[in-house]
Amino acid sequence: MRTIDSSSKKDGFRMPGEFEKHAGCYIIWPERPDNWRLGAKPAQKAFVDVATAISRFEPVTVVASSSQYVNARYMLPDEIRVVEMDNDDAWVRDSGPTFVVNDSGDVRGVDWSFNSWGGLVDGLYFPWDKDDQVAQKICELERKDRYRLADFVLEGGSIHVDGEGTLVTTEECLLSEGRNPQLSKQQIEMVLKEYLNLEKIIWLKRGIYLDETNGHVDNIFNYVRPGVVALAWTDDETDPQYEISKECFDILSNETDAKGRKLEVHKINVPKPILITDEESKGVDAVEGTLPREEGDRLAASYINYYTANGGVVFPLFGDPNDELAREKLRQLYPNCEVVGVKAREILLGGGNIHCITQQVPRG
């Protein structure tokens, strides 16, 4: 497929909201033993559950390495397409393409540079060259032309849009030293506006407490629909998360979007702090150059890290009393969707959650 020397804005394409209609969803099969415990077997079961839940609402493609293709095909339901593709890890939200659409129904991919969430400064593993090719390969599978930004680092989990000209992100991530230190905040805004066709960017300060991706916005904030947003929250003022969420709430409550609307902010309480157990820590291979999983480390658990499908919402369950409160809140926010919970601790142990391991392809 073509690599286009232009931009989404010049060509009349925009990034749609995740709540708009999808043609399908991509997931990468987990396997690396220095990130997923017990050879990724528990995580693979969780990924199967997520893929199966989403496949009730839209077509799902799972890509797996050559060494895991047969295993993935065996474990996944027949209606889920499985395709062989090299990768370094299973975070397609971040390594995959950001799709844009135009008014004629055409779809293109934006292929950002990927450097493992910080490159040689504070990246989570090395090398990452296979992951940096994932976006192009998915565009090829989908027969979609792409824009390639080889000199601009961005992960899909660091942005959320309303599809009507507004993007929300965090300074903690986009202004981090390991992403685009050669660019000013204003220059980063210019790139985002040009390639996603935006009019306004709302900057939150920080993401979820101890988020190892430098505070990805998709773990603390999501767009329900234009003008209506969901925010991770805690009522415990002694929790470090409280200060962060309160700061986000104050920013969002005093902002307007590209259309001049005040934002309607809905709070969804996070679970009680979830810590890595001794057994979970010992199940991860220790490898130099990758982030260790230590007993007692707090995980960045949030119900906001959910996936919005066609007529469905798939959200993480943590075995916490707030699981059911989150389910009820999501039902209220998405009255026309079926809300499905999936046990997601094994995904959380790897450093993210359901939104992080999925990437939607818009219908156009």
Swiss-Prot record:
Query: Which residues does UniProt mark as catalytic?
Result: 356 (amidino-cysteine intermediate)
Q: What Pfam family is a match, any one?
A: PAD_porph
Q: Alphabetically, which GO biological process terms does the record hold?
A: putrescine biosynthetic process
Look up the EC number in the record and give it.
Answer: 3.5.3.12
- Covalent S-S links between cysteines: none
Looking at the record's lineage, which domain of life comes first? Answer: Bacteria
Database matches in SUPFAM superfamilies? Pentein
Q: Which terms are listed as keywords in the entry? A: Hydrolase
InterPro entries reported for this sequence: Agmatine_deiminase (IPR017754), Peptidyl-Arg-deiminase_porph (IPR007466)
Reactions that this protein is recorded to catalyse: agmatine + H2O = N-carbamoylputrescine + NH4(+)
Family under the similarity heading: Belongs to the agmatine deiminase family.
Q: What protein is this chain from? A: Putative agmatine deiminase 1
Q: Which organism is it from?
A: Listeria monocytogenes serotype 4b (strain F2365)
What is the name of the gene encoding this protein?
aguA1
